């Protein structure tokens, strides 16, 4: 098995011009991000664009928020127990993380269109608020794939940039990163297959892809200069600088939960259902398939 490509989800996208015009600085901790959110709202700006819409998959963007927050409020071991259901979904620590997400998403002053728009805004349309004049929002938390849905002609590093979704300094949990990856598996043990898999572990193999764009490697031995853009070099620094890396939790859960009750539960949450009731319902769905 060889993991040859990863995506980073622990990102916040923003317009450098909007930040400069308003005197905002990149937050280095979650406490600073919370304070920045409050300041933006008090300045009359809308801090966040959040959209959970995705057709039959509506709700998944909120599961990413939850996973990132779990990694920032509790240890990696707790995250792993949550994902495997060794720790029940309705554990108080999970409910706490959901309410941290709610502190951003359930405040009408913090979200473009107000809380009522969170569940109905398509995730592909959500970041467009960064680029309107005046801007409809100042920040958008989403993975490294989202530039594919930015307005045509948007220049990364100029019109838009990103920063690491920061950790709580008070929690002392380092720099956790949430992501996903492509895993290659050999289906036979032929010599040529074995040699190819070995080759994919070498920096040279990764560097051949890096220059083509759209490829992010976790390999620490590559020459970052081989990336096609500064943006990808920045993503590489976030990825390889992680003190903890965890795969998307919902992707690791049984489909009935991770691509079912977890998605719909987060929609219920932003539509007014309590975190405890949502967590209880998700746990019940997990119990039903055991």
Which residue stretches match the model-derived regions?
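Periplasmic solute-binding protein
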Residues: 3-26, 31-34, 45, 51-82, ...
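Short helices/loops that flank or line small-molecule/ion binding pockets
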Residues: 18-19, 35-43, 122-140, 264, ...
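Conserved C-terminal helix/tail region of periplasmic/extracytoplasmic solute-binding proteins
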Residues: 20, 44, 239-290
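Extracytoplasmic/periplasmic substrate-recognition and gating elements
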Residues: 21-22, 145, 151-216
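A local structural motif
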Residues: 22-25, 105-123, 135-136, 153-159
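Glycine-centered hinge/linker elements that transmit conformational signals in sensory
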Residues: 37-39, 83-118, 165
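Short, solvent-exposed loop/beta-turn-alpha elements that line the ligand-binding surface or hinge
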Residues: 56, 71-96, 152-155, 167-176, ...
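Short amphipathic alpha-helical coupling segments at ligand-binding clamshell hinges
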Residues: 93-100, 189-200, 205-209, 231, ...
């Amino acid at each position: 098995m060889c993991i040859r490509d990863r995506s980073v989800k622990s990102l916040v996208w923003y317009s450098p011009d909007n930040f400069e015009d308003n005197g905002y600085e990149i937050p280095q901790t979650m406490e600073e991000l919370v304070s920045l959110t409050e300041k933006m709202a008090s300045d009359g700006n809308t801090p966040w664009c959040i959209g959970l819409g995705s057709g039959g998959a509506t709700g998944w963007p909120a599961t990413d928020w939850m996973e990132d927050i779990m990694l920032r409020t509790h240890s990696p071991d707790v995250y792993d127990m949550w994902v495997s259901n060794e720790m029940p979904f309705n554990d108080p620590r999970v409910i706490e993380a959901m309410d941290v997400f709610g502190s951003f998403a359930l405040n009408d002053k913090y979200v473009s269109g107000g809380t009522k728009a969170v569940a109905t805004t398509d995730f592909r349309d959500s970041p467009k608020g960064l680029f309107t004049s005046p801007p409809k929002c100042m920040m958008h938390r989403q993975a490294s794939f989202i530039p594919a849905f930015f307005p045509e002609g948007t220049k990364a590093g100029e019109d838009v940039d990103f920063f690491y979704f920061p950790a709580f300094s008070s929690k002392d949990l380092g720099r956790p990163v949430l992501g996903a990856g492509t895993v290659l598996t050999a289906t036979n043990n032929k010599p040529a297959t074995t040699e190819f898999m070995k080759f994919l572990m070498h920096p040279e193999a990764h560097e051949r892809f890096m220059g083509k764009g759209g490829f992010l490697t976790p390999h620490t031995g590559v020459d970052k200069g081989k990336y096609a853009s500064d943006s990808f070099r920045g993503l590489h620094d976030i990825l390889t600088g992680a003190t903890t890396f965890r795969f998307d939790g919902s992707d690791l859960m049984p489909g009935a939960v991770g691509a079912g009750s977890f998605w719909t539960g987060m929609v219920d949450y932003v539509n007014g259902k309590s975190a405890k009731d949502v967590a209880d319902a998700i746990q019940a769905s997990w119990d039903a398939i055991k």
